Every structure is written in C-alpha cells, then in structure tokens.
Regions:
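Conserved HGGG/HGGXW glycine-rich cap/lid loop of the alpha/beta-hydrolase fold
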Residues: 9-83
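Conserved hydrolase catalytic core segment
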Residues: 110-149
Length: 296
C-alpha cells in the first residue's frame, strides 16, 4: 500500500480504477481506516467510470501517528464543548482538511468529487470552503455542521460511548466490542456481525488497532465547535445523504447543511442509522453516481 507526504506528514492511500477517469476522494469518519469503506461501494464507483481514492486520515491506520501526543479523555472533551470552552488538541479538523488538500496536490489532481462520511463530511466541508476550485462536487453522508442548536446524540449512545470499565483485550473481544458499538449507533435491526461490518472491522484491527488515535480524533471534532462559517463558503454542487434513524448524528445535522449550501440536495434514507448498511447500498450508490454524473 503506498504512502505519500501531504501537509508535512505521511498518509496511506489506495487508488482504484482508471487513472484517467474522474477522481472521487473518499474521506473516512472518526476512528475509521480506509478499510472500513465497503468494497462493493468502491467497486460500484469504479464500474460507473470513476477513479476512487481512499486514504487513512492522520493518526489512524497506516498514516502518521501522533503517538508522542497526550491522549485527551473523552468525557471532559464532551463537557467542555457543551460549555463552549476551547480545547487544547494535538490537531484540528482544519489540519485534517489541509492533509486532504495536500493529498489532492500530491496526486496532481486538478478536480475531485469529495465524499465524506460523518467526521469525514466535516473535513470535506472545510476542504470545499478552502479550495473551491479543486472540488467538482461534495457528498456529505451522516454528517453535520457543529451548530450548537442542533439535537445531540441519543442518550443511550452517549452512555455507551463514555461508559467506564475494563477495556476488552484480545483480538476477538476487541472486534466484538467494536461491532457491538455499531449495533448501538447503526441501522436498527441489522446484524452487524453478519452483514459485512465485522469483516471490515477485523481488517482494520489487523492493519493497526489504536484506540488512542480515535480519542485524539474525537478531540479534534470537539475543538471544532460550530464551523458553519466553512459550510457557508461551499460553492460545489452538494448532495446530503442522511439516515432517518441515525442516533449519533441526528438527521437535523444533514438538514442544516442542506439549508445552508445554495442548491444542495437532501436525500433522507428511511430507516438507516449511523452506518453504511448493505440494505441501503443500492440506494446510496444510485444517489451518488447520479450526483457525480451530473457534475463531471
């Protein structure tokens, strides 16, 4: 797997499809490695005539790790953010956006279609605002703007995320715990142990398991606060995809993006939670390919 230097750090990436085809750059969410993207989604984009680039954000997977940095504690991050107190973090969403822009430049891409999921959608909004001339289109999946007036995650999700106790040890137990978390935040009624999610999580674990990295990325999200000033600067054709049953990032987050970006199209995926479920893959893929085709 290749690495390149972007924004002064090493980023791991994968490049799929015809190098001369219009490129799609996919930005993963909190704690997610490039291996968490469903293989079928990538394959369908390639079959649709696109070049697809996935990568590990900084501090995750096989990209640069901030192992020498202090790891923030999750609960204080959440509390401080609610009171509007600025956090000290190893890096910010803006840094991660600059990484993404550096990747675009290092790959010598003139224009890209950006797809960002969850935290990746937050990073994507920053990229669209910072380098509008490089973005053909933007797709934000289950993401938000940091608007403090929006609904918070469901209480049962917050309890699960901040619960104390002895962390699981051993490969299988750690993978099981991660899958169980997706059962809490994901599509209701899905068996995440059999729908492909466990396989992708296991693949990520085997590449590089680093819980501290996830905590540092969460600190970057918390420190961003309200970033609607970036959202307002988006000029790229924008598609917003959001599940009606998302308990982690309520659908109002996607609606906020759609209400701010001129001409944005919002598609509600009925019954989908905070995951990319196989059940909804055809619908998601169709919406995105239609969007790419209209703006390539």
């Amino acid at each position: 797997m290749p690495n390149l230097t972007a924004n002064g750090i090493s980023l791991a990436y994968e490049d799929h499809g015809d190098p001369s085809a219009p490129p799609i750059l996919m930005i993963m969410g909190l704690g997610g490695q490039l291996s968490l993207w469903p293989d079928k989604l990538v394959a369908d984009f390639v079959a649709g005539g696109y070049r697809v680039i996935t990568f590990d954000n900084r501090d995750i997977g096989l990209s640069h790790q901030h192992t020498d940095e202090r790891t923030p504690k999750i609960v204080p991050q959440i509390i401080l953010r609610r009171f509007g107190i600025k956090l000290k973090t190893p890096y910010t969403l803006r840094d991660m956006a600059d990484d993404t822009i550096g990747l675009i430049d290092a790959l010598k891409l003139d224009h890209v279609h950006i797809v960002g999921i969850s935290m990746g959608g937050m990073i994507g909004q920053h990229v669209c605002a910072l380098v509008p001339d490089k973005v053909r289109s933007f797709t934000g999946i289950m993401t938000t703007t940091g608007n403090p007036k929006l609904p918070r995650p469901d209480s049962h999700v917050m309890k699960a995320m901040i619960k104390r106790g002895t962390p699981p040890t051993g490969r299988e137990a750690i993978i099981d715990a991660s899958v169980d978390m997706f059962a809490i935040i994901g599509t209701p009624g899905e068996d995440h142990h059999t729908n492909g999610m466990r396989e992708r999580i296991a693949r990520s674990y085997d590449r590089n398991h680093s819980p501290a990295s996830t905590a540092r990325q969460m600190a970057a999200i918390a420190s961003a606060g309200d970033f609607r000033d970036f959202t307002r600067r988006i000029t790229a054709p924008t598609l917003v995809l959001h599940g009606s049953a998302d308990p982690l990032v309520p659908i109002e987050g996607g609606q906020d993006i759609a209400s701010i970006v001129p001409g944005a199209r919002m598609e509600t995926i009925e019954g989908m939670g905070h995951d990319v479920s196989d059940r909804f893959m055809p619908e998601l893929t169709a919406h995105m390919l239609e969007h790419f085709n209209a703006h390539s």
